[in-house]
Design a protein with these regions (language model features):
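Catalytic phosphate/nucleotide-handling subdomain of diverse soluble enzymes
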Residues: 80-85, 225-292
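Gly/Ser/Thr-rich active-site cleft segment
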Residues: 1-29, 140-184
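Nucleotide/phosphate-binding catalytic cleft detector across ATP-hydrolyzing
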Residues: 1-66, 200-201, 205-213, 306-312
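Glycine-rich phosphate-binding loop of actin/hexokinase-like ATP-binding domains
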Residues: 2-19, 51-150, 246-268
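Structural signal for terminal/edge beta-strands and the immediately following C-terminal loop/tail
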Residues: 282-312
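Alpha/propeptide regions of enzymes that mature by internal proteolysis
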Residues: 32-49, 53-65, 125-132, 136-140, ...
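A glycine-rich phosphate-binding loop feature that marks nucleotide/adenosyl-phosphate handling sites
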Residues: 70-72, 171-181, 231-242, 291-302
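A contiguous, well-structured pocket-lining segment that forms one wall/lid of small-molecule binding clefts
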Residues: 159-227
Length: 312
């Protein structure tokens, strides 16, 4: 029955864990193989988030932990041994390179690291598949575009170099200091790479990241408001994108709460780790089934404070 998909919040047809023969899922495995599906938490906070909880164990922490899995929807978990909250924020695809003028997926040739000299305003970059910075005489990589981590770093570096104002405007007056600032209709752009492929950061690019960051930040701020928290003991960034973000730039752009950099941890594929734990450990399966029942689901779409934080 697809009717529940036409209303928000979406009602889950199944939210409990499933244990069934693999043949029931048409998996080409031994006829005696069993399949296990972790429980879902809410409509946009699925079994992958349950696996992240199993991997990172926030429910066993005495201090509050914030877990963020950044994607087209950011899944957010906040809490400790006393209380767990979970929500999803519609960040969109900008963090993954979509909606960015020179954006692309993380692949060889994509810029993943950026530094801008605050005096000369000249950039240097590193690309996937090459260990050298572009100012190294031996650098000969083909530069093809900007992946997610590169987008975050170049905007963070532009902020540090004062090429971007506090409200996210590329400062046209900086054109007097560098030819890399170019007029584009009524806005300006910054030329990051001027090779066979010209790569610029435009005002629209910054706006796209601002919107994505705004949705992400509104999500964890909402959960912190509900939990009555001002700080957390650690922030865990999970998923492929989270594993490649430099914590410094995540903090510069306000993607994570302020705090010591060492408290921001890249967990990598935490969902995969949790899935493997559930695969081989019956006690882990029982544990996560019990924990998920206690998670408080927060629907950002119906929370007025989410919109307030997003606008801020």
């Amino acid at each position: 029955d697809p009717a529940p998909l036409g209303a928000a919040p979406f009602a889950l047809a199944i939210d409990e864990a499933m244990h069934l023969p693999a043949t029931a899922l048409d998996l080409n495995l031994n006829s005696g193989a069993q399949a296990y599906v972790l429980p879902c938490i809410a409509g946009h906070v699925g079994a992958d988030t349950a696996a992240v909880i199993l991997s990172e164990q926030p429910h066993k922490s005495e201090e509050p932990v914030l877990i963020i899995d950044i994607g087209t929807n950011a899944e957010i978990v906040l809490g400790d041994s006393k209380r767990l909250l979970a929500a999803s924020s519609p960040t969109g695809p900008a963090f993954e390179g979509a909606q960015i003028s020179a954006g692309q997926r993380a692949a060889p040739g994509a810029i993943e690291r950026v530094r801008i000299d605050p005096e000369t305003l000249e950039p240097k970059v590193k690309v996937i598949g090459n260990d050298l910075w572009s100012d190294d005489p031996a650098f000969d990589a083909q530069v093809t575009g900007l992946c997610g981590s590169g987008i975050i770093e170049v905007i963070g570096e532009m902020v540090l170099a004062r090429l971007v104002t506090a409200d996210g405007i590329i400062d046209g007056e900086m054109a007097s200091r560098t030819s890399r600032i170019e007029a584009s209709d009524r806005t300006f752009s910054y030329t990051l790479w001027d090779g066979a492929t010209k790569i610029q950061v435009t005002q629209d690019d910054i706006r796209a990241i601002q919107l994505a960051k705004g949705a992400l930040t509104a999500g964890w701020r909402l959960l912190m408001d509900i939990a009555g928290l001002q700080t957390v003991s650690r922030t865990v960034l999970s998923g492929a994108f989270g594993a490649h973000i430099d914590p410094l730039y995540a903090m510069i752009l306000g993607m994570v709460p302020d705090g010591p950099l060492e408290t921001i941890i890249a967990a990598g594929n935490a969902a995969g780790t949790g899935a493997r734990l559930a695969l081989v450990n019956g006690a882990a399966r029982r544990e996560i089934e019990d924990v998920v029942r206690k998670v408080e689901k927060i629907e950002t779409a119906t929370e007025a404070k989410f919109q307030d934080h997003f606008v801020d």
